[in-house]
Amino acid sequence: MWKLNRWLSSIFADTILYKLVFMEKLQPNLFFPLAGVAAVASLASCSNKQKPVEQKPLNIVYIMTDDHTAQMMSCYDTRYMETPHLDRIAADGVRFTHSFVANSLSGPSRACMITGKHSCANKFYDNTTCVFDSSQQTFPKLLQKIGYQTALVGKWHLESLPSGFDYWQIVPGQGDYYNPDFITQNNDTIQKHGYITNLITDDAIDWIENKRNPEKPFCLLIHHKAIHRNWLADTCNLALYEDKTFPLPDNFFDDYEGRPAAAAQEMSIMKDMDMIYDLKMLRPDKKTRLKSLYEKYIGRMDEAQRAAWDKFYTPIIDDFYKQNLQGKELANWKFQRYMRDYMKTVKSLDDNVGRVLDYLKEKGLLDNTLVVYTSDQGFYMGEHGWFDKRFMYEESMRTPLIMRLPKGFDRRGDITEMVQNIDYAPTFLELAGAEIPSDIQGVSLVPLLKGEHPKDWRKALYYHFYEYPAEHMVKRHYGVRTEHYKLVHFYNDINWWELYDLQADPSEMHNLYGQPEYEPVVKELKEEMLKLQEQYNDPVRFSPERDKE
């Protein structure tokens, strides 16, 4: 394939150069393709023509974490912590300010990402009943077909073994923070010593350095376990942020008026956060629902790791039980402990992103590599009194998305159009020069990376959450989001509608559904919802006829 590109390049270079210079008139945001038939590296004068230099196809490093919310990245929100290495990605590229997922749950979100299709199309609806059909089309398989090397390290969480990768090494299920097991391509399970975020990064760098063909472009998926519950920090970071006190979100003590589905959840920091499993307040005489699972996790630590762990937590445990906190004081204590543990886990993640960036720069790969950072979904940091995700409300539907752009991209700063995780697959395919199959439901972000603002860009996003009854008891629901409004329908064992004005009520506290003055808005949004359900062929659809009953 690369020989064909060189041959075509030699024939068509002058033609392409003419088009770039005279037809495009060298616009300031001119986009030079980094993969495909040919790319001109320098402009030769008419009197002294030089042989055009072939631009190598770009590499893709796609870093995804678990449950990393945008408000815990300083390139999005400076109130809580600094993430200098993640900020480097945003500073050298773009930050998407309206980035969302199609189903805010780990496995389904990953299936949407890798297929470019909604859950109703890729058939991976939830974490409890589904196994990913690995025979279906994915973007790594399509990249392989055009000569890319593909690799996956870290979290997979789709139940079946990965396919479409020249190399993979994954953690089983959620994985463990300390001394975790990994499944190899031989379907063997091995245990590695250390902290999982460091180990996944080690494997990623080792693959680039020692296991790939340097003559071929590559796509590497670095998918971390962090920052998933129950936020076990690396021992070197245990003491961080202990001097910080965080204000409770304004709606921490939300009463869920007019929102019965929100009231029925079981993800409250005050009521549902486990004192031992989540907050590490382990004592032999105390029992909680998830105590044994926590003991299993810390039981993986070696002697030195456990000694450091106990040295840090023992005085905190003693002080906590001595205080005998109750009510709102206890809720605030739990929130502070949760915030600190979460941030310590983020710190390890940010440091390891820095390791990857430094390695790519040292090896001369950074200028020809697209570096993408995102999370499988957002997360609640006390908003509505919650932890976890699942709901279509902003904190869990919204996810960070930043891209460090390769040489040849002039675009910098914020991209404000609404994008979704089904858009990643077609974006990677277009940038690599691959054909985008017609059944992919996402839309390539390349026009946005070129600085364009397409007039026909989507005006609404579709969302559908299926996993109920299950952990946290978030009811099934689907909905649409526009720049101004969000309409949500909870169904199955409930029939409840919610409407939010996102500009007047960004915290989504006031359900406007049923108010006469909003009937035209509801009518328009229901029409949009039905249109998207038909477009994506979702068998669970809003029925205008039943809605009148």
Residue ranges of model-derived segments:
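Serine residues within intrinsically disordered or low-complexity segments
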Residues: S9-S10, S45
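Formylglycine-dependent sulfatase
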Residues: K19, E24-Y491, N495-W497, P506-E527, ...
